[in-house]
Amino acid sequence: MKKILLVLVLFLTGCVGIPENVKPVDNFKLEKYLGKWYEIARLDHRFERGLSRITADYSLRDDGGVRVLNRGYSAKENEWKEAEGKAYFVKGTDQGYLKVSFFGPFYGSYVVFELDHENYQYSLVCGPDKSYLWILARAPEMKKDVMDKLVAKASALGFDTSKLIFVDHR
């Protein structure tokens, strides 16, 4: 029984880890990060497959956490899909390192590792390993030079940016 509990604890802890060589941003200001973000690009995952016009809205929860509302359009089903979750800081509130849950007690990492600290207009986010990557912006389009910079940073850290899916917001 102790072995099973240990394996479970290690598994759950691993889900909120940080990929090798990735460092969450410091001087993170949640109040500036709140609001609507557009998903510009991502690595493929089942839960977003086939969706376009994807956004994430972040707002404060009564318990001090963050309400996460992800939304995307499925052309195949001709309808909007939504998922609501909750996020909490893993360490200090000034570090871009949170854990997010969309179902039950299971959390995954939400690591902001690149950010426009001045205006909070773009961010580079990953999950617990390098198969999770998102490029987010405050507008549905991003300048090419900014996109190139973010893709280069992710690539240098070992993310397979050749597999990025660029989200259609039309």
Which residue stretches match the model-derived regions?
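A beta-rich soluble binding module of mature secreted/lumenal proteins
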Residues: 15-170
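Sec-dependent N-terminal signal peptides
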Residues: 4-13
